């Protein structure tokens, strides 16, 4: 199985790139091969098709409302759904003041999905909207926990890679990680 992680953002989105690069550095420090690219646009229209293990896109809402969101493909694998579910739950525990406002299941030809994952194949794909960037309350809460969010994403990605994309193995790893966290907190 492919153990390469693909991280992408929109080309001119500074905040998303900051998170993507911080996560990429954290994963590289842990020995994971990471590819970072910009989303599909006129400048990279002729890139070749690639296959990765995990593909994640990062973006922010810009409508002034409050909250974060998650977008998955309608035909995503069980490991992809479990991975996104665990990441969203852990992100929710870390940032309870940023509420989830959107969970979408889209087709592959959806405009946003196509922009981020055109010519990319992966066992696990997801688009995370980390918060609303032009909502001051959301943005401040996100910036306070920024290093912890990077570590959270890195931990979950490592867990998924070590399971070799086996759903049962991944669920066991998540369960044992939660038990370790509860023991440390007590």
Segments and roles (model prediction):
Residues 2-3, 7-10, 38-85, 108-134:
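Active-site microenvironments of hydrolase-like enzyme catalytic domains
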Residues 5-6, 55, 65, 105-185:
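Active-site-adjacent mobile loop/cap segments within catalytic or ligand-binding domains
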Residues 22-33, 86-97, 156-167:
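Structured segments of extracytoplasmic/periplasmic soluble domains
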Residues 36-39, 102-104:
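A generic structural motif
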């Amino acid at each position: 199985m492919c153990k390469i992680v693909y991280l992408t953002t929109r080309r001119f989105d500074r905040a998303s790139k900051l998170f993507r690069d911080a996560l990429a550095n954290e994963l590289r420090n842990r020995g994971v091969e990471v590819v970072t690219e910009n989303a599909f646009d006129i400048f990279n229209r002729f890139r070749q098709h690639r296959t990765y293990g995990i593909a994640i896109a990062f973006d922010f809402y810009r409508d002034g409302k409050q909250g974060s969101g998650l977008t998955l493909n309608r035909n995503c694998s069980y490991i992809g759904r479990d991975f996104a579910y665990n990441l969203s739950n852990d992100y929710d525990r870390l940032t309870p003041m940023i509420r989830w406002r959107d969970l979408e299941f889209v087709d592959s030809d959806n405009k946003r999905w196509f922009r981020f994952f055109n010519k990319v194949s992966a066992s696990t794909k997801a688009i995370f909207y980390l918060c609303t960037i032009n909502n001051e309350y959301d943005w401040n809460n996100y910036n306070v926990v920024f290093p912890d969010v990077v570590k959270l994403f890195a931990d979950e990605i490592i867990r998924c890679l070590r399971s070799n994309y086996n759903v049962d193995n991944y669920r066991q790893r998540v369960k044992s990680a939660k038990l370790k966290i509860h023991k440390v907190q007590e």
